[in-house]
């Protein structure tokens, strides 16, 4: 993919289905393109509780968020890169299809300063404030500026460098780029373009038109509501309008974005994809997972907004602050690469060329796959587990239900097998710790359900056993089976055993595909004289354990909550979202336990 990007020389958007994978792709592309713009665009919320209303219980839930300032800066940096005119690669999650504001308006609000330009100091300050920069003559941070005599220092919201504009009277004498900590000069420039500090903002003339449009919609809507909803909507909207007229923005201003953008009811909002223009390359990573996510975003958002609008918390125009519908997203698919080990029918139908990348540089083959009858399957499974355990290897066993996973784990434990089970109700921190303990050899077998598919990278696993493999369905279709086989493909002794009494179409297809891939790799290994070797991968350090929370005193819990929260923020800043999520889950458990102890 990196070679395609280099050869096409197009601006490129890479979409991944979660923050962790996006961060990995971002890091890799930064290494591949050290001299190019590589940006990162994901949701900037460490915590997000959307505004909603539950009519059954008459419960209004206010929007509650915790914004990661580092990621907000990177989002602004990504859009600034795209409007800079330089070749740019952006790695994003499905956040890229959510409303972002007009790229035209955002660029219109940018401040261009050139050496020798005539501009009054007060005018420049006014423009910075309009672009949502905050004056702070004491402490400088991204998004701040300060004024000292005829010198204006600015740290763009998307940069670590400081811009110093030196004036002589009403003329720009010099533009310098400084290190914002040491204030040492890094260079000079004759032209600088400073993009706004926020994505949601509009020029004053557009704001006036939008206010009129919002007032008109409010007037029309009030005639359709009963007294309670009418009073609620009128009070809320008028307060927002006052804030917009006085300050240029309000809390939840994105819900009025249709009026600011000049869009018609139902018309799609602007999003990150609009910053790319017409000619760009789109790469959808793990497309068999990412595309269904893109499909589902609109429906969930619409359902939540409907209650808010029906009961007078929002104007109907709030519907139009939304993610793209999938058919709208498809309009951006012009030059696209779908990347997937198991592409669905959609990708196959859309693609005019399918390029297979089957060979691994490590020489590792897809696992040997065997189908065995269900009769005496438990005895057979225990025998196979024993063989792996003697060799210091691990086993994954996948069942169809949570109850089956728990019962199987209990049965194996009675047979002196060191086993644990894993399912969706186990929190993120516990999941990661279980996998870590499996790799360390604290136990030998992990029993799970669908969690044994994408992203479980355990080189120590040499056996994957699939129970009820002939039960056709989502967890036993061709795609799922191949993904599950893949959990044993990191080990040179990788084997997958399917316990089934019938060879279903899915099993037959998965066996044929796996054999085809094995043959390709074997041929490649012979040609290049490669001897397959098990992947060597470091085992991460333990973040925290869960079992000790209930035994701690309130004082110790309070102390730990402070430490875990600090750890969570550090991981988030470092873009290690997997560990940040683990810390968040532990923090919530600590807080629940503290509340229980305080009630006693």
Show the residue positions of the predicted features:
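Charged, solvent-exposed alpha-helical segments that act as regulatory interaction surfaces
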Residues: 246, 548, 593-596
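C-terminal tails and terminal domains of large nucleic-acid-associated
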Residues: 561-597
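Long, amphipathic alpha-helical segments that form or neighbor coiled-coils/leucine zippers used
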Residues: 547-550, 565
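ASCE RecA-like P-loop NTPase motor cores
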Residues: 1-540, 544, 553, 557, ...
């Amino acid at each position: 993919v990196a070679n395609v990007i280099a050869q096409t020389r197009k601006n490129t958007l890479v979409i991944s289905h979660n923050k962790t994978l996006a961060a990995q792709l971002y890091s890799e592309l930064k290494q591949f393109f050290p001299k190019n713009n590589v940006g990162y665009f994901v949701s900037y919320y460490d915590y997000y509780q959307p505004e909603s209303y539950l009519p059954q219980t008459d419960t209004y839930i206010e929007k509650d968020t915790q914004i990661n300032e580092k990621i907000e800066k990177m989002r602004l940096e990504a859009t600034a890169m795209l409007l800079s005119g330089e070749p740019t690669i952006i790695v994003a999650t499905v956040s890229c299809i959510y409303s972002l504001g007009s790229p035209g308006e955002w660029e219109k609000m940018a401040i261009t300063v050139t050496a020798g330009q005539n501009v009054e100091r007060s005018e420049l300050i006014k423009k910075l404030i309009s672009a949502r920069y905050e004056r702070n003559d004491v402490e400088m941070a991204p998004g701040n500026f300060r004024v000292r005599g005829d010198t204006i220092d600015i740290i763009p919201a998307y940069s670590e460098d400081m811009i110093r504009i030196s004036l002589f009277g009403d003329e720009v004498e010099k533009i310098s780029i400084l290190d914002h900590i040491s204030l040492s000069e890094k260079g000079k420039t004759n032209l600088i373009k400073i993009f706004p500090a926020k994505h949601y903002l509009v020029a004053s003339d557009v704001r006036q038109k939008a206010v009129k449009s919002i007032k008109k919609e409010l007037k029309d809507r009030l005639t359709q509501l009963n007294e309670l909803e009418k009073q609620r909507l009128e009070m809320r909207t008028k307060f927002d309008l006052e804030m917009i007229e006085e300050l240029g923005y309000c809390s939840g201003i994105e819900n009025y974005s249709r009026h600011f953008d000049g869009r018609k009811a139902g018309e799609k909002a602007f999003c990150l994809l609009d910053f790319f223009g017409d000619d760009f390359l789109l790469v959808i990573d793990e497309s068999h997972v990412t595309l269904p996510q893109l499909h589902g975003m609109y429906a969930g958002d619409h359902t939540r907004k409907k209650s808010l609008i029906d009961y007078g918390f929002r104007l109907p125009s709030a519907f139009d602050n939304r993610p793209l519908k999938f058919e709208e997203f498809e309009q951006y698919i012009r030059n696209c690469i779908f990347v997937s080990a198991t592409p669905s029918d959609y990708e196959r139908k859309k693609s005019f060329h399918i390029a297979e990348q089957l060979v691994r540089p490590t020489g590792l083959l897809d696992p040997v796959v065997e189908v065995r009858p269900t009769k005496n399957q438990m005895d057979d499974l225990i025998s196979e587990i024993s063989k792996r355990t003697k060799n210091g290897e691990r086993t994954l066993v996948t069942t169809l239900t949570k109850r089956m996973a728990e019962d199987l784990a209990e049965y194996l434990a009675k047979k002196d097998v060191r086993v644990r089970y894993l399912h969706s109700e186990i929190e993120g921190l516990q999941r990661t710790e279980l996998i870590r303990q499996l790799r360390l050899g604290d136990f030998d077998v992990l029993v799970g359900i669908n969690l044994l598919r994408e992203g479980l990278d355990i080189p120590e696993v040499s056996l994957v056993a699939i129970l009820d493999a002939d039960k056709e369905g989502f967890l036993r279709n061709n795609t799922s089976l191949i993904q599950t086989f893949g959990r044993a493909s990191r080990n040179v002794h990788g084997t997958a055993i399917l316990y089934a009494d019938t060879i279903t179409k899915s099993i037959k297809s998965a066996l044929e595909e796996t054999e085809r891939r094995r043959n390709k790799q074997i041929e490649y290994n012979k040609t290049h004289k490669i001897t397959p070797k098990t992947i060597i991968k470091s085992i991460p350090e333990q973040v925290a354990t869960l079992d000790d929370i209930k035994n701690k005193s309130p004082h110790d819990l309070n102390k730990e909550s402070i430490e875990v929260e600090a750890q969570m923020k550090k991981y988030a800043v470092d873009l290690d979202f997997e560990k940040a999520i683990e810390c968040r889950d532990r923090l919530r458990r600590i807080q629940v336990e503290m509340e229980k102890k305080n009630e006693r």
